[in-house]
Amino acid sequence: MNNVFVYLEIEGTTVADVSLELLTKGRKLANQLGCQLEAVAAGNNLAGIEKQVLPFGVDKLHVFDAPGLFPYTSLPHSSVLINLFKEEQPQICLMGATVIGRDLGPRVSSALTSGLTADCTSLEIGSHEDKKEGKTYENLLYQIRPAFGGNIVATIVNPEHRPQMATVREGVMKKEILDANYKGEVIKHDVANYVPETDYVCLLYTSPSPRD
């Protein structure tokens, strides 16, 4: 509950660099917030995937392993995150500002009625004072990104809704292993409990009509 989550992009059976960069940043954010870092891997043939992930300081790795989850398609992966997040109630979710992240992020944030900031170049933790409402919010995610054609840098906060979601550009954050022997929990989920059959794309084959 209220942890930092990172969605892992899987290229075959390899975790994408942008996701490993986000694990590094996610670990730092979790330390600041005094919470755990969790990651979500959805794909096929993911046995041993934890060896790539846990050394970055991941406390819990959620694994969804099924043939219908690779290659990536929108609906199954959206259902994985939406239904998992309803259970786990994360305070932050990070994913790469990639073709997949730009498709998946808005779907998940819309379903959960949470905010999403795209193409962030920096993430920090800080407070926000809403003078109009007379409220001060602590430990918010500062989602920092270029705006107005890159002429200014905007800092965006989401005080009311969770999770605070952001996509982050590849290569703007360092990828650093925390501890090669880091011990985290691996949770293997039953995909059928999260993804309805109707989400999967079915490829239908038809035989040509016989010639007269």
Predicted regions and their residues:
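N-terminal glycine-rich FAD/FM-binding segment characteristic of electron-transfer flavoproteins
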Residues: 1-207, 211
